[in-house]
């Protein structure tokens, strides 16, 4: 995934880039390939990356520290489900998008309607998901 081709690198609409520019996005991702790939995509959108957090302990520390506008959260981090972390994000009013490479049929009802991006994702999918978060929650 680290060497992207034109099918993955979609052009970024200038207005969308401006809307996301400077937004601090927490990345919770345990894959040593997907984490940096996601950070690269966010950089192309003008976002500042917090993380990537490769495990739950690092993710909890970053969430407790705050200082980000939204999060991209992999549903499974080293075999752990991330829902306790999501509770922390929700308590802080931080909007987030789930990412997953699995069909995850056992999603708790509370989180079923949460925005989600299926791996492997593209720049366009990440852009759309983040813009959706900020349109839903303009204060963030």
Give the location of each predicted region.
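Non-catalytic signal-transmission and effector/linker regions of two-component phosphorelay proteins
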Residues: 1-24, 108, 122-140
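A Lys-centered signature of the CheY-like receiver
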Residues: 119
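Two-component/phosphorelay signaling modules centered on CheY-like receiver
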Residues: 32-51
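Active-site residues of response regulator receiver
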Residues: 74
């Amino acid at each position: 995934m680290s060497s992207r081709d034109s099918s993955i690198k979609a052009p970024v609409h200038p207005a969308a880039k401006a809307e996301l520019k400077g937004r601090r996005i927490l990345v919770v991702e345990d894959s040593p390939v997907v984490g940096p790939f996601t950070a690269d995509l966010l950089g192309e959108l003008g976002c500042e990356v917090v993380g990537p957090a490769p495990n739950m302990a690092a993710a909890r520390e970053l969430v407790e520290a705050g200082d980000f506008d939204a999060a991209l959260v992999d549903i499974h981090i080293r075999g752990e489900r991330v829902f306790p972390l999501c509770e922390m994000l929700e308590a802080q009013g931080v909007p987030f998008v789930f990412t997953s490479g699995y069909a995850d049929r056992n999603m708790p009802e509370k989180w079923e309607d949460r925005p989600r991006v299926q791996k492997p994702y593209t720049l366009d999918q990440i852009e759309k998901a983040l813009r959706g978060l900020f349109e839903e929650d303009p204060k963030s």
